[in-house]
């Protein structure tokens, strides 16, 4: 048992140290690897990232080639993964350098978004369930504990189940601000060459990749410094049937037990396209 605690302590310290050695924002421009593949894996990067944002608890790397801008995101914390499965990650790019959620020239893309009935299944199978998940069958019905239809003991095979469930149910990307594409839901199997890749690895870590063709980003060219925003949406922004907020009573007052899921967290950064060497 003593050895087990030593191993666990080492893993916690290693993870914390890794995050602490990274900058809060990416500081350099990067050419995307020639073998980049949006499959929900970070193997082409050697699982190394350029920054770690403490507010969102997101590791990330931004890169580009002559055709696309790429975002590669890694999330380790189970509760943060649950938040993402509930409401998605929104990535916003502004080619004029604004850091304003309401800027009219923002381009934003949100993924994943899916029917809520699939979220508890994915969260449980991935190992991201940290406490009871309440679900509702509809208005006027009493919320009940989610009971998985499978043995939820963590295992490599269940992580595969989580990835398969995610791919089977997260079928659209929410688009806003691209002149050539109407605002709204775009199929992940689109002809506009906007590509997403997402998966859970064998430890339950979530990897999300996004490719945006530069032609949709309105004039971003080499040496142009632009701004980006990575946002973990609040569940309250995407309310769907079946969602339930749990409450605790503190000093006689009702307090949400899911403030982390019901709060938006985000950060802004700046990036310049990397030129071909």
Where are these regions (language model features)?
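Acidic, glycine-anchored loop motifs typical of Ca2+
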Residues: 37-44
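Long, compositionally biased interface segments
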Residues: 221-277
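Sec-dependent signal peptide cleavage junction
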Residues: 18-33, 269-277
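Short, well-ordered beta-strand segments enriched in hydrophobic/aromatic residues
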Residues: 40, 68-75, 206-214
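Beta-strand-rich interaction surfaces with strong enrichment in secreted/lumenal proteins
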Residues: 49-50, 58-61, 194-200, 258-260
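Bacterial Sec-dependent N-terminal signal peptides
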Residues: 1-26
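Surface-exposed, glycine/proline- and aromatic-rich loop segments on solvent-exposed faces
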Residues: 49-166, 232-240
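Short helix-loop boundary/capping segments
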Residues: 165-207
């Amino acid at each position: 048992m003593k050895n087990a605690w030593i191993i666990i302590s080492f893993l916690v310290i290693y993870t914390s140290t890794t995050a602490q050695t990274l900058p809060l924002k990416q500081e350099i421009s990067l050419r995307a690897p020639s073998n980049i593949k949006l499959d929900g894996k970070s193997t082409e990067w050697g699982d190394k990232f350029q920054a770690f944002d403490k507010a969102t608890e997101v590791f990330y790397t931004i890169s580009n080639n002559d055709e696309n801008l790429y975002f590669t995101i890694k999330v380790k914390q189970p509760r943060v993964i649950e938040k993402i499965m509930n409401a998605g990650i929104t990535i916003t790019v502004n080619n004029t350098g604004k850091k304003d959620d309401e800027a009219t020239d923002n381009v934003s893309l949100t993924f994943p978004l899916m029917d809520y009935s699939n979220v508890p299944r994915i969260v449980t199978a991935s190992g991201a369930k940290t406490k009871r998940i309440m679900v509702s069958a509809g208005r006027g019905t009493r919320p009940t504990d989610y009971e998985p239809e499978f043995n939820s003991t963590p295992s490599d095979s269940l992580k595969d189940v989580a990835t398969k469930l995610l791919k089977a149910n997260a079928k659209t990307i929410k688009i806003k601000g691209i002149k050539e594409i109407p605002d709204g839901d775009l199929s992940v199997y689109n002809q506009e060459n906007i590509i997403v890749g997402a998966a859970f690895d064998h430890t339950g870590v979530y990897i999300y990749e996004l490719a945006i063709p530069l032609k949709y980003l309105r004039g971003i060219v080499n040496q142009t410094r632009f701004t980006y925003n990575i946002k973990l949406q609040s569940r309250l922004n995407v309310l769907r049937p079946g969602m339930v907020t749990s409450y605790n009573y503190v000093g006689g007052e009702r307090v949400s037990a899911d403030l982390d899921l019901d709060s938006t967290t985000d950060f802004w950064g700046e990036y310049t396209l990397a030129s071909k060497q």
